Amino acid sequence: DQGVKIERNEKVEKPADLRKDYDAVLMAIGGHKGVRLPMEGSSLEGVILNVDFLKNCGMGKATGMGKKVIVLGGGNVAFDCARSAKRLGAEEIHVACLEAREHMTADEEEIQQAVEEGIMIHPAQTFERITGTGHVTGVDFMNVKSFTFDENHRAVIHREENSEHHIEADTVIFAVGQRPDITEEAGLALGRGNSIAVRDIETDKATSVDGIFAAGDAIYGTKSVIMAIESGREAAAQIDQYLGGNGDISEKLAPEQKPDAYIGICEGFGYMQRKNRCI
């Protein structure tokens, strides 16, 4: 109804090529590529990426999940995977993450509901290796005393001595983050976590190529839906200015109505008990 034309099944390898036909381009591609940690056993059969698992769940396709599942990660997506596995019939489900319990990034409600469903939580764990020959048989862990990040944003982990332990599993799901599905061949400068670099995440959504802007998870990683909407609106306002407008994209979805402060007379109001005065 608004004149938007949707082109489906189109692959755009170089966004700059779109500038031949369009005055401005917005990259709102999200973060739909799962992260596979470069650790021993990560390529074994039975190791699944979060986005693939949840996509297959949503489409009713086979997930490749077994009966004993370990989810590596402590955010909301990790618990989405764990609780989905529960509903798909997994008999034993573990969620393990690097953060201590009080610092886990998942919503507290998600964590509590998972525990109520019988999902086992293992905070402050480092993933040493995924075991198996051909197919996953489990994961070796060690307890984490503390961890920090170096100047390259790599985790520096302080392990507890003699704390190595093993949890058996036939399925391991990586849920340690997502990234935009884009490469340097696209011709845009990229930032941390394969994000699209913009001049300023908060105030300037322009990319390294003139006329191309970016917004949402593609520039700052996986956040909430409302943050993506806000980022998209900010980008739309900036694009409007780029095209010669004033950047005002506000709209009134319904006419404003000023309520009438007068609600009438209630006989004997002054003699009523306070609890009966509420309307």
Task: Give residue ranges: language-model regions.
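Cofactor-binding loop segments of dinucleotide-utilizing enzymes, especially the Rossmann-like FAD-
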Residues: G30, G74, C97-A100, D217
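Feature captures the FAD/FMN-dependent oxidoreductase FAD-binding
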Residues: D1-E40, R129-D140, F147-T148, A169-I173, ...
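FAD-site-proximal beta/loop scaffold in flavoenzymes
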Residues: S43-G66, F149-T222
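Rossmann-like dinucleotide-binding cores of NAD(P)H-dependent redox enzymes
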Residues: D1, I6-E10, C57, A82-R129, ...
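General small-molecule cofactor/ligand-binding pocket signal
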Residues: K5-E7, I48, M120-H122, D140, ...
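A conserved FAD-binding loop/helix module that cradles the flavin
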Residues: C81, A215-L243
